[in-house]
Design a protein with these regions (language model features):
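Post-cleavage N-terminal segment of exported redox proteins
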Residues: 1-31, 95-157
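Short acidic, glycine/proline-rich loop/turn micro-motifs
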Residues: 144-146, 180-183
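Extracytoplasmic electron-transfer domains, predominantly the class I c-type cytochrome c fold
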Residues: 32, 67-117, 124, 131, ...
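Sequence/structural segment immediately N-terminal to covalent heme-attachment motifs in c-type
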Residues: 10-11, 15-16, 25, 29-55, ...
Length: 202
């Protein structure tokens, strides 16, 4: 690493300001599976490195479920790592998604492909289920409700026409896709994310 990036002492200052090195402590009010999932997500899985918003020092703003910013989604390296809070899928589907990169109704893309290829496919099924149990326990924020009557009719018709031409052949006219083959667009994290960056890259 070239100078001045090879100088290490500034990292000590950064660590003292931003790093929480408190050891993981299991919660007595939660199940063994939940605690195992929490440990894997917060520690070795370091899911927050991509999915948690960053502060002024590029530090993760939160480290566990006690803060609503934890895993609330963040833009990183030209992709948007979607919020993992308030997920709308079953524990079994999420565990399969972590193991295979696709499930009955969803598929992963971008850097999450690398996570599956290099990491989560090698976890035991119990560990992937534990991660799923933990993530599904995290509450999401209230969805933004939009008044469909305020959308111009011409825009709706144009959107319908474009969807029918470019999307419906694979994803079906109702957006539900085909199980284990084509991901659903309904309740899709990438499609429904506030930030469209990943959707534009798929």
């Amino acid at each position: 690493i070239p100078w001045p990036l090879s100088i290490r002492w500034p990292l000590g200052i950064w660590n003292s300001l931003f790093v929480d090195d408190t050891p993981f402590t299991p919660r007595a009010d939660k199940s063994a599976a939940w605690n195992r999932g929490a440990y894997l997500v917060q520690g070795p899985g370091h899911c927050g490195a991509c999915h948690t918003p960053r502060g002024v020092g590029m530090q993760e703003k939160a480290f566990d479920e006690r803060d609503e910013q934890f895993l609330a989604g963040e833009e990183l390296n030209g992709w948007y790592a979607a919020s993992l809070r308030g997920l709308k899928m079953s524990e079994a589907d999420l565990a399969v998604l972590l193991r295979d990169g696709r499930s009955k109704h969803a598929a992963l893309s971008g850097p999450m492909d690398e996570v599956v290829t290099n990491s989560t496919q090698y976890l035991t099924d119990d560990d992937n289920r534990a991660i799923a149990a933990y993530l599904l326990s995290l509450p999401g924020s209230e969805p933004v409700k939009r008044d469909a009557s305020k959308v111009a009719k011409a825009e709706m018709e144009n959107g319908h026409r474009l969807y029918a031409r470019y999307c419906a052949t694979c994803h079906a006219s109702n957006g539900e896709g085909a199980e284990y083959a084509v991901p659903a667009l309904k309740d899709n994290l990438t499609v429904n994310a506030d930030n469209p960056l990943t959707l534009l890259r798929v």
